A protein has these predicted regions:
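Conserved strand-to-helix beginnings and helix N-cap segments that scaffold or border functional pockets
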Residues: 30-33, 56-57, 88
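Loop/helix-junction capping segments adjacent to catalytic residues or to phosphate/diphosphate-binding pockets
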Residues: 26-29, 53, 84-85
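Non-catalytic, surface beta->alpha helical segment in thiol-disulfide oxidoreductase systems
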Residues: 77-96
């Protein structure tokens, strides 16, 4: 796959590598994004439904590594853990 995923970056406190894969129309994705902003952490995110071609394929391939059902939101933390769906308690515990 030659496509590159162009992530958006949200500035904040560095709590490790945090990547949010979301859909622009997803309420739970918006809640997850809002929680990350409330926590004041730096994170990267992408709205997968706004991607096309190789970039979309690459994003879906990456999500499936962590979440075979490819559901949203998928929040990957430090390339070692994935929280699927909006789970405020798990997100707060994982980010500290």
């Amino acid at each position: 796959m030659g496509g590159k995923i162009d992530m958006e970056h949200n500035e904040g406190i560095n709590k490790g590598q945090i990547t949010l894969y979301a859909l622009s129309t997803c309420v739970w994705c918006k809640k997850t994004k809002s929680l990350l902003e409330d926590l004041g952490v730096a994170y990267d995110y992408v709205y997968v439904d706004n991607l096309f071609g190789d970039a979309r394929d690459k994003a879906l391939e990456e999500i499936k590594r962590w979440n075979p059902r490819c559901s949203f939101p998928s929040l990957v933390i430090d390339n070692s853990r994935c929280i699927v769906g909006f789970d405020e308690k798990k997100i707060r515990e994982a980010i500290g």
